[in-house]
């Protein structure tokens, strides 16, 4: 598995992906924080269903990595481009994100849709504060779409 060759992301590794390598470069992280902050944490658990066909699956040690954990997100273009691709389910290019929701209804609907086509689904529940304690950002898709002026590929009025 690709994720096996990477260590789980933590608070030492994540800032390296958010800030530029060269000191003289302008960092998007100074302008628009993605750094993990408890004040941004959802009040509900993060929910994700996955199956044998899902791009991000837990490793043997329980770590769930994105398909491109090494991708740099230190400038507006890299964030906008990678997030635009992530939102479009037809684009299967590895990216630095893992999708979660706080909506049990959305998870239930997705599971019912997938089970007929893809078989059994596994539900993973994550405490957002655990992610933040490990230095991992928790992003709100609609807020990021608004900030980076990303068009909703499915016309859902940015209900993510």
Can you say where each PLM-predicted feature lies in the sequence?
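NAD-dependent ADP-ribosyltransferases
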Residues: 1-160
């Amino acid at each position: 598995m690709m994720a096996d060759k990477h260590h789980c992301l933590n608070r030492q590794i994540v800032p390296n992906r958010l800030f530029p390598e060269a000191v003289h470069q302008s960092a998007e992280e100074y302008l628009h924080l993605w750094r993990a902050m408890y004040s941004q944490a959802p009040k509900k658990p993060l929910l994700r269903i996955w199956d044998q066909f899902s791009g991000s699956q837990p490793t043997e040690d329980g770590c769930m990595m994105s398909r491109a954990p090494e991708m740099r997100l230190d400038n507006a273009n890299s964030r906008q481009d990678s997030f635009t691709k992530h939102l479009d389910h037809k684009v299967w290019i590895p990216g630095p994100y893992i999708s979660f929701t706080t909506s049990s209804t959305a998870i239930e609907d997705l599971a019912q849709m997938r089970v007929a086509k893809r078989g059994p689904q596994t539900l993973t529940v994550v405490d957002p504060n655990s992610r933040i304690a490990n230095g991992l950002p928790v992003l709100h898709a609609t807020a990021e779409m608004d900030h980076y002026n990303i068009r909703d590929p499915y016309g859902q009025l940015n209900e993510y």
